[in-house]
């Protein structure tokens, strides 16, 4: 067996190759982070190995810096092991009392760790899908938050320019309202529209839901509005609505990509009533390989959903709060999914009602339901069975 340790950096990578006896096949060498460097690494590995040798390549999970070399190694059918930097750091400290940390030392540490740890799992196609899902779901999460902030800006601007409008429609954030405010961003502009033109605009944008009656209501309200006439705010409103439409289009595109991956994976978690594709994708992406977790409690701890513990002498905390450490994305996805599951799944609905009847606050009761959901997800993903079959 031959082990290759790679310390990944932005512009270059340090490498070390050891055999199964810990002897150096290729002392620490540096390659540039480009195709020539990748080919140099591959050629060096081939020069140091025989056809019968089993090759293991290890590198740290260093975010985007490792993506390209990882893809190159996988394309060349090499078994790659992605390691937690915390684990490699602790392992390096265990090898020596000296406080020595260089890229070359790290490369050799990774190679040595490959030799000593037989339980390491190689990077697989499933891991690739998880990385893709993680990138997409986190990107979507950020885009949704960005859109939410813009919607708050729309509400603020409408309060200044045409405050009466909010009482005439179920929501400011619907297609008909956006179409109206994109063309006429203020009470003064709306009050001067010809009724027929306003009716046609609302009818088209609402797909027939609104007609002449709603147009009359809005125009009359605009004529007597207390809204300010501020061209700068009107321009800001138009641009904000335009940005919301663009981001919504981007979110739709992201969700299509997520849906394609989920169609390939077809995970058992989707069989749970109330768990949608987007929530399921984020949960799977953040958890990754379920075999890395010994129990559902480990997943809860990873998500930061476990209660904190504090004890000092005779003092023990009576009202433990959530740790809220770990993956905030996973925590968000689990709580969001739990709300829908409690609505659509009678078992969870009854469980939530039971906890509420015990006098627990809604959020506390929901956290109990989240723990129940995590136990169910863990069981389904480990067994590979659908929810109805498992029940």
Residue ranges of predicted features:
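A detector of single, family-specific signature residues
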Residues: 1-391
